[in-house]
Swiss-Prot record:
GO terms for biological process: defense response. This is Tryptophyllin-13. It comes from the Eukaryota. Belongs to the frog skin active peptide (FSAP) family. Tryptophillin subfamily. Pfam families: Tryp_FSAP. It is found in: Secreted. The modification Pyrrolidone carboxylic acid is found at residue 1. Disulfide bonds: none annotated. Transmembrane segments: none annotated. InterPro entries: Tryptophillin. The keyword Secreted applies. Keywords: Amphibian defense peptide, Pyrrolidone carboxylic acid, Secreted.
Amino acid sequence: QEKPYWPPPIYPM
């Protein structure tokens, strides 16, 4: 059972 990641992961630029 996979849980959708929300909010989506944010990568620092």
